[in-house]
Amino acid sequence: PWRTYVNYNDPRLIKNYYPKMKEWFSYVDKYTVDGLLKRWPDTQYRDWFLGDWLAPIGVDAGAQSSVDLVNNCFISECLGTMEKIALMLGEKEEAEKFAMRRKNLNELIHQKFYHPGKGIYSTGSQLDMCYPMLVGAVPDSLYDDVKRKMMTDTEKQHKGHIAVGLVGVPILTEWAIRNREVDFLYQMLKKRDYPGYLYMIDNGATATWEYWSGERSRVHNCYNGIGTWFYQAIGGLRIDESIPGYQHVFIDPQIPKGLTWAKMAKDTPYGVIAVDWELTDNIM
C-alpha cells in the first residue's frame, strides 16, 4: 500500500487497510519473545519462516541466527513504513509509537546478532551485514567498520560476486543505492562466472532463473530486484516520498568507473521522466 501511494499518489489502499496492517502486528507479537520475532511453533506455516532464499552455493542462508536476523530486520523495516503511513494519515501519536518500537527493536537486533570480536552480524553474509545497516540497527560508530567488513569479505570470500538470494537482492540493491556504492555493485554485476546475471545470459537465459545455478525453473521472476539499481543509481532517478506520484523527483546519477553514458525513461502518472547523460573528459 505504501509503495502504491508513493508511486501513484493513490492513498485508497492505505486508508482501507491501515487497521489490518496494525492488526498484523498483533500476529507478530504473538510469536515475539523478549522483543524479537522467533520461528513460530509447529503449524502448517512453520516452514515459511524464511531468511534469504535460494542464495548461492556456499552461503549459509539457512542458519537459524541468519533467519532470525533477517526476519527481525524485516519487522524493523515494516515499523518504519508504518510510521510514515501513520504520519500521512495524521495519526501522530501512533507514528511516535511505531518509531519508538522500531528504535527498541533495532537496539535488540544489534545486541543479539552483532559479534564484536568478528565485526559481523550473525553469519557475516552479505545479507546479514547489509540488512542491519539498511534498517538502522547498526550504531553510527560502527557503521563504516561494518560496511568495510562486508565489502572486504565480498572480495575475499566470494571473489567479488553477488552472494545473496531472492530475498537479499532488493535489500542489497537498496543498500548500495542509498550508500552510493555504485562501483561495489557494478563490479559484481560484471562477473561472468557463477553466480551472476551474466552467467545466466551466457548460458542462454531469456528470463531470470529460480536458482543462480539454473536448476529447475528458468522462467521464475527471481532476483529481479536488481532492476531498480539501473534507473535509481545509474539513471539517478529517485522519487520524493513527501510529494508522491513522481510529482517531484531527484535526479543524481551515480557513475561507476568505466561507464560513460546512460539513457533511461520511466512512465509516471504525470508523464514520462527521461534521463540522458554522457561523460566527456569526466564532465557530465
Residue ranges of model-derived segments:
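Amphipathic, non-transmembrane alpha-helical secondary structure
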Residues: 2, 15, 22, 26, ...
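Active-site acid/base region of carbohydrate-active enzymes
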Residues: 7-71, 88-134, 141, 191, ...
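Well-ordered alpha-helical scaffold segments within catalytic/enzyme domains
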Residues: 1-13, 74-92, 131-141, 171-179, ...
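Generic recognition of stable, solvent-exposed alpha-helical segments in well-folded globular domains
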Residues: 12, 16-23, 70-84, 93, ...
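Structured segments of extracytoplasmic/periplasmic soluble domains
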Residues: 24-27, 31, 81, 85-88, ...
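Acidic-aromatic pocket-rim loops
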Residues: 57, 61, 157, 219, ...
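Non-catalytic C-terminal accessory modules of carbohydrate-active enzymes
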Residues: 100, 183-284
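Extracellular polysaccharide-recognition and catalytic grooves
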Residues: 115-216, 220
